[in-house]
Regions:
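ABC-type ATPase nucleotide-binding domains, specifically the catalytic core motifs of the NBD
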Residues: 29-31, 73, 114-127, 138-139
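Helix-to-loop junction immediately C-terminal to a conserved catalytic motif
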Residues: 69
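Conserved ABC transporter NBD signature motif
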Residues: 77-89
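Short helical segment in ABC ATPase nucleotide-binding domains corresponding to the A-loop/adjacent helical element
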Residues: 110-119, 129, 133, 237
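Conserved ABC ATPase "signature" region
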Residues: 125-144, 196
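Conserved ABC ATPase signature
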Residues: 148-152, 156
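A short, proline-enriched helix->beta-strand linker immediately N-terminal to the Walker B motif
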Residues: 167-171
Length: 273
């Protein structure tokens, strides 16, 4: 496969990366096949970045996220956090999924945010409770701390999941298409709330999406991936541009051009009678 990677200059690239994915090949087995999800993928995420993995289905975005989380090991290459190889899951990498059922249904909103802190014994219970309440305040859910998940809307459930993850103060927040199951209006609202939350706390996030507008809005770095197996197609700066207007629209067009260059070339190569 001909991969024409376009690499943009990274702000702060002279500093050591927080997360390094070094020529990583990932494979997994199905009943019929051994699937190569990614092939020699490499990128670096620096502290405080909003780094987006963007590509179509089959490019290994979610598989990469699982590997960063420590749920699977590369067959080639290495993934390092703060210079140390990732061998297993840890509380320094917290995940937010797109499914609404990621919350514990028998616990209240506060109980869900509090639960991983108590399991990890990060602080005394009373201190952890105040910390959990502070995170709920950041996602505007203080009034719902005693409510159970089945009483919440999809967007509210995702806010709880984000608060629960950030309450652990992870080195990297891993988000696997967290807003994909929401309606368009709620999705945009959640995107804006995530950006505001980032402005308040400057956490590091690795965000997976197949939506070009979402990538342009959320990311300040965007890694473009091609499928079957997943490979790096390019890497661009975004810095939260509006995907509709000005530089954001131009960036969206450039991303589309890079991601679908092979398809355009194939169409142009077909003789027309």
């Amino acid at each position: 496969m001909n991969v024409n990677a376009e690499i943009a200059g990274r702000p702060g690239a002279m500093t050591a990366p927080l997360l390094a994915v070094d020529n990583v090949t990932l494979q997994y087995k199905t009943e019929q096949h051994l699937v190569t999800a990614t092939y020699r993928v490499g990128f670096e995420v620096h502290e405080g970045e909003r780094f987006v993995l963007l590509g179509p289905s089959g490019c290994g975005k979610s598989t990469l996220l699982k590997a960063v989380a420590g749920f699977m090991q590369p067959v080639e290459g290495e993934i390092r956090l703060s210079g140390k190889p990732i061998r297993q899951p840890g509380s320094d990498r917290m995940m937010v999924f797109q499914e609404f059922d990621q919350l514990l249904p028998w616990k209240t909103v506060l109980g869900n945010v509090l639960f991983p802190q108590l399991v990890n014994k990060r602080m005394p219970k009373d201190q952890a409770t105040e910390h959990a309440r502070a995170m709920l305040a950041k996602v505007n859910l203080s009034r719902f701390e005693n409510v159970f998940p089945h009483m919440l809307s999809g967007g509210m459930k995702q806010r709880v999941a984000i608060a629960r993850a950030l309450a652990m103060e992870p080195a990297v927040l891993l988000m696997d298409e967290p807003f994909a199951a929401l309606d368009a209006l709620t999705r945009r609202k959640m995107q804006e709330e995530l950006l505001q939350l980032w402005e308040d706390t400057r956490f590091t996030v690795l965000f997976v999406t197949h939506s070009i507008p979402e990538a342009v809005l959320i990311g300040n770095r965007i890694l473009l991936m091609s499928p079957h197996p997943g490979q790096v197609k390019g890497e661009l700066n975004s810095d939260g541009s509006d995907p509709v207007d000005g530089t954001g629209a131009k960036l969206s067009d450039r991303i589309h051009e890079i991601l679908f260059a092979d398809r355009i070339e194939e169409q142009e190569a077909v003789p027309h009678g």
